[in-house]
Swiss-Prot record:
InterPro entries: RsmH (IPR002903), SAM-dep_MeTrfase_MraW_recog (IPR023397), SAM-dependent_MTases_sf (IPR029063). Its main location: cytoplasm. Specifically methylates the N4 position of cytidine in position 1402 (C1402) of 16S rRNA. This is Ribosomal RNA small subunit methyltransferase H. It catalyses: cytidine(1402) in 16S rRNA + S-adenosyl-L-methionine = N(4)-methylcytidine(1402) in 16S rRNA + S-adenosyl-L-homocysteine + H(+).
Length: 334
């Protein structure tokens, strides 16, 4: 089937924050359709390693390897494993890292991947080729666990009612397709369509859970701190408030802004060792009105960036993310 072309979000802003330079080495931790990778390679005579855990991107990566004249290499791995990817190549430092967090339009557009309630397909949602599926989650997890996932990862206020409807429905027959889950959620919420489809937040929450997206992001941020050379740049684009909040907390703490940003909704960042980053963006950067009008995915995008200094990476810091329902528990039940 034909799919809509993937448009990299905030390309000019990403390149402005990264400032690619000749002779440098960069990581595109979320290769996807290769938009950022091509942009970086075009901006300077540099080298780049693309990383992605989705095996479906391999043909695109292979094309870029062949066209890059030895300047591009690819590894199929989660971006949290970028340290291992570099170590396998005898590399211990890079000059910049770009991360584009969340599902890509390519994945959403492919019905067989099961990411979208708008396209009938198997209830999968995995970005990698292995691990539990969204169907495994909705058919095996306890009602309270599903409710917690929907509430925390989807910020769905009707989480408990939706979880109850799901458990009632699965007792009659396993929930195996995207359209059936969407129909169950719609019934649970009364079928009211506001600005978004009733199933939007539930699908988002399941995707985040199945792919351990917040855990992956937390580990990738900590790996970036260890891998960036002095004056190396970290650029992160997020599309969800939970992700942006995590990036903001990490960068503010590593920049030594202890106590800053505290409010009744957001706890103040605790003091730590010597700052290891300097902020390039004091506030999140959003896409321009023109880009948001042309590319709907850009509307929720937030970019944050920072520069690494010579201070050692923090070796003992609080975890950025603790899963509300460990994915390992579901894996053990399969």
């Amino acid at each position: 089937m034909s799919v809509a072309p993937h448009i990299p979000v905030m390309m000019s802003e990403v390149l402005h924050a990264l400032e690619p330079r000749s002779g440098a080495l960069y990581i595109d931790g979320t290769f996807g359709a290769g938009g950022y990778s091509r942009g970086i390679l075009s901006a300077a005579d540099c080298k780049l390693i693309g990383i992605d855990r989705d095996p479906a991107v391999q043909p695109t990566a292979t094309q870029l390897v062949q066209a890059s004249g030895g300047r591009f290499a690819f590894a199929e791995a989660p971006f949290s494993a970028m340290g291992e990817v570099l170590a396998s190549r005898g590399i211990d430092q890079v000059d910049g890292i770009v991360l584009d967090i969340g599902v890509s339009s390519m994945q959403i557009d492919q019905a067989e991947r099961g990411f979208s309630f708008m396209r009938k397909g198997p209830l999968d949602m995995r970005m990698a080729a292995s691990g539990p599926t969204a169907a495994d989650a909705v058919n095996r997890l306890k009602e309270a666990e599903l409710a917690d996932i929907f509430y925390v990862y989807g910020e769905e206020r009707r989480s408990r009612r939706i979880a109850k409807f799901i458990c009632t429905a699965r007792a009659e027959a396993k929930i195996e397709t995207t359209d059936r889950l969407a129909e169950i959620v719609t019934r649970a919420t009364g079928g009211k369509h506001s600005k978004i489809h009733p199933a939007t937040k539930v699908f988002q929450a399941l995707r985040i859970f199945v792919n351990d997206e917040l855990g992956e992001l937390a580990r990738a941020l900590e790996a970036s701190e260890r891998l960036l050379a002095p004056l190396g740049r970290l650029v992160v684009v997020t599309f969800h408030s939970l992700e942006d909040r995590m990036v903001k907390t990490f960068l503010r703490s590593r920049a030594g802004l202890a106590g800053g940003g505290g409010s009744r909704y957001e706890p103040a960042v605790e003091a730590g060792p010597a700052p290891s980053f300097s902020l390039l963006t004091r506030r999140a950067v959003s896409a321009s009105d023109e880009e948001a009008a042309e590319n709907p995915r850009a509307r929720s995008a937030k970019l944050r960036a920072a520069i690494r200094n010579e201070a050692p990476a923090w070796s003992d810091s609080p975890s950025l993310h603790t899963s509300i329902v460990p994915l390992a528990r579901l894996e053990a039940a399969l």
